[in-house]
């Protein structure tokens, strides 16, 4: 054992161990380097986050500062609003107009203005003589007027009404200043209207006409009307209509209106009696005007309108504006018209029937818009699905109107030839079945005397026509022979002989048709080859009509044509009432249901508007020009079906 322990270690083993230790140390060093890199990146991200947090805090401080400014401005605006409400409540403030100089210089009269007044004037002049009405610069004492004008102490302003405590101009939120209620503002407006009527009654406009122009004096003082709560603007002069007049200082004492009494002061200045306002002190508002000359708005009286021939004479207005009684008579008469004044050439129809023959309308109303006559049946009640009476032009005769004869002017009424209402279909005599047009009525045969003589032997259904029974037998898988035999046994001997003969000949043809027009997938039978071809596309998924503009494909040529119009912009179906165009005809019909069924008759003696020209299928309304040759080739190609060129029937 001791010999084994004392055996020396091989140098190769030592070298391998040392190499393994070195590799392990290198891996640990690489791992340490990666950890140091990740630590540096984390520190950098942390620094970026701290920087972003600082920026957010700065932005938040800025937002808080802006919010504080907004709150301060809101409080200031609220105080201004309370100030304006107090002024409107007191109804006793003045508007001072500062006329600017000719070249922007300060007039000599303004040498003794205060500093804030000069600063205000500079701001006004900087605005290129724009109109400024500032309710912010409200002064509590009116003596500034005389101080600015004459440069001396003004006289005391007196009132005849009782004194009340002064209302502060800029009340604080805790001052408890009264705020007018909405009903008080309405009362102010009503009082202003009453005073305006009193001014018109007393002839105030005559007094205002004798006033000199505002340009004669450097100062213009105008008192706002007592209805300050309802300030309106004259559209012609741009001046508030509540400004009653302009009073120069030299003519204040002599030319005041009757409802504003005046008396002389001790120093020759103006003293106004402000008995109409007893709530608070007088307020002053600084204002500059753009106009050098002000036109006083004079109310218009009905007498002036009559002098210029603007109003209707007694009885004239009723000829142009019918009374409600006449309007009610119009509604009660339905499509007929009421009696009118002979001046307009209108008369009342005596009976609801209409004239027949070559007639002219006897009622002349306004001209109907272009296009109302093509679909006139919807608007006049004509049934264009039925043939109109002989000699009657449906494009010229609206329903419910009388017509005069060209010979003697008498009405020719024939109830038997009256046009049928729009919703009344053509009916066969003695039958209840209705048809939309006269050709359909002619094609419908008379009812057989036996009712439904053709009965199916399989299911027992009865039919009036043998053609219907044959089609039904194909769906049941039988031939026409069985159907004919069943029909012969039902109709009798004579009918049986003819039915039997027809059955032998028709049985073979129906068998051939049944085998030729039967779907091999589901066994369904069809009466036309086109229907079978269209049905087979449902099983095969074939869409033989591709669009050259996009990737869509269609099973029918008509659907491809409708889709292709979305690319070309062609809308061939145009509404004759409003002019809107549509791609499909059913869209046009749906749109025409929204139009009212009332139209206007053409004027008497005027020709009818021409029919609208048919739309050009080779011209796009969006492009306003002819279509390209490639589009024409595409349209011709799209018109080819699997059976060849389409015959216009639209089956495929």
Swiss-Prot record:
State the SUPFAM superfamilies in the record: beta-beta-alpha zinc fingers (SSF57667), KRAB domain (Kruppel-associated box) (SSF109640)
Modification after translation is described as: Ubiquitinated by PRKN. 'Lys-48'-linked polyubiquitination by PRKN leads to degradation by the proteasome and may play a key role in regulation of neuron death.
Q: Does the keyword Ubl conjugation apply?
A: yes
The Gene Ontology biological process annotation of the record reads: negative regulation of DNA-templated transcription; negative regulation of transcription by RNA polymerase II; protein heterooligomerization; protein homooligomerization
Does this UniProt record's set of keywords contain Transcription? yes
GO CC entries: cytoplasm; cytosol; nucleoplasm
Indicate, by first and last residue, each region the UniProt record lists as having compositional bias (Pro residues): 607-618
Query: What is the protein name given in its UniProt record?
Result: Zinc finger protein 746
The organism encoding this protein is Mus musculus
């Amino acid at each position: 054992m001791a010999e084994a322990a004392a055996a020396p270690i091989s140098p190769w083993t030592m070298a391998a161990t040392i190499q393994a230790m070195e590799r392990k140390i290198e891996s640990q060093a690489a791992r340490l380097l990666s950890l140091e890199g990740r630590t540096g990146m984390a520190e950098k991200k942390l620094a970026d986050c701290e920087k972003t947090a600082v920026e957010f805090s700065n932005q938040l401080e800025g937002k808080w500062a802006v919010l504080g400014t907004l709150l301060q401005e809101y409080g200031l605006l609220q105080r201004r609003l309370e100030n304006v409400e107090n002024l409107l409540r007191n109804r006793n403030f003045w508007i001072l107009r500062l006329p600017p100089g000719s070249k922007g210089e300060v007039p000599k009269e303004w040498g003794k203005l205060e500093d804030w007044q000069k600063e205000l004037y500079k701001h006004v002049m900087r605005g290129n003589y724009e109109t400024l009405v500032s309710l912010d610069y409200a002064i509590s004492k009116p003596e500034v007027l005389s101080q600015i004008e004459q440069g001396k102490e003004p006289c005391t302003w007196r009132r005849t009404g009782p004194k009340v405590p002064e209302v502060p101009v800029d009340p604080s939120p805790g001052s408890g200043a009264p705020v007018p209620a909405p009903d008080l503002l309405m009362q102010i407006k009503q009082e202003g209207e009453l005073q305006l009527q009193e001014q018109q009654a007393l002839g105030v406009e005559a007094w205002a006409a004798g006033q000199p122009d505002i340009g004669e004096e450097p100062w213009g003082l105008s008192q706002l009307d007592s209805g300050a709560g309802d300030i309106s603007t004259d559209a012609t002069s741009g001046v508030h209509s509540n400004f009653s007049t302009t009073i120069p200082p030299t003519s204040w004492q002599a030319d005041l209106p009757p409802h504003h009494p005046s008396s002389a002061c001790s120093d020759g200045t103006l003293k106004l009696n402000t008995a109409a306002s007893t709530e608070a002190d007088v307020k002053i508002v600084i204002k500059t005007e753009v106009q050098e000359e002000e036109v006083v708005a004079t109310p218009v009286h009905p007498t002036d309108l009559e002098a210029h021939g603007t109003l209707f004479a007694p009885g004239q207005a009723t000829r142009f504006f019918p009374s409600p009684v006449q309007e009610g008579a119009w509604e009660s008469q339905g499509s007929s018209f009421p009696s009118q004044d002979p001046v307009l050439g209108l008369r009342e129809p005596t009976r609801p029937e209409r004239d027949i023959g070559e007639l002219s309308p006897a009622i002349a109303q306004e001209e109907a818009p272009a296009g109302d006559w093509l679909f006139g049946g919807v608007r006049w009640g004509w049934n264009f699905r039925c043939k109109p009476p002989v000699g009657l032009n449906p494009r010229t005769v609206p329903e419910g109107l009388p017509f005069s004869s060209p010979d003697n002017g008498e009405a020719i009424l024939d109830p038997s030839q009256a046009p049928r209402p729009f919703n009344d279909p053509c009916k066969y005599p003695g039958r209840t079945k209705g048809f939309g047009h006269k050709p359909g009525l002619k094609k419908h045969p008379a009812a057989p005397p036996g009712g439904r003589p053709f009965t199916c032997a399989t299911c027992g259904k009865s039919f009036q026509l043998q053609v219907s029974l044959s089609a039904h037998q194909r769906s049941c898988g039988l031939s026409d022979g069985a159907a004919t035999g069943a029909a012969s046994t039902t109709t009798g001997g004579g009918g049986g002989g003819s039915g039997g003969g027809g059955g032998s000949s028709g049985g073979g043809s129906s068998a051939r048709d049944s085998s030729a027009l039967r779907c091999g997938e589901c066994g369904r039978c069809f009466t036309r080859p086109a229907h079978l071809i269209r049905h087979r596309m449902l099983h095969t998924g074939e869409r033989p009509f591709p669009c050259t503009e996009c990737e869509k494909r269609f099973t029918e040529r008509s659907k491809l044509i409708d889709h292709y119009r979305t690319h070309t912009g062609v809308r061939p179906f145009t509404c004759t009432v409003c002019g809107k165009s549509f791609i499909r005809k059913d869209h046009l019909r749906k749109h025409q249901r929204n139009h009212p069924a009332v139209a206007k008759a053409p004027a008497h003696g005027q020709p009818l508007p021409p029919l609208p020209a048919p739309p050009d299928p080779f011209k796009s309304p969006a492009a306003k020009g002819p279509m390209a040759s490639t589009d024409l080739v595409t349209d011709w190609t799209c018109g080819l079906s699997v059976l060849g060129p389409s015959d216009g029937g639209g089956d495929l």
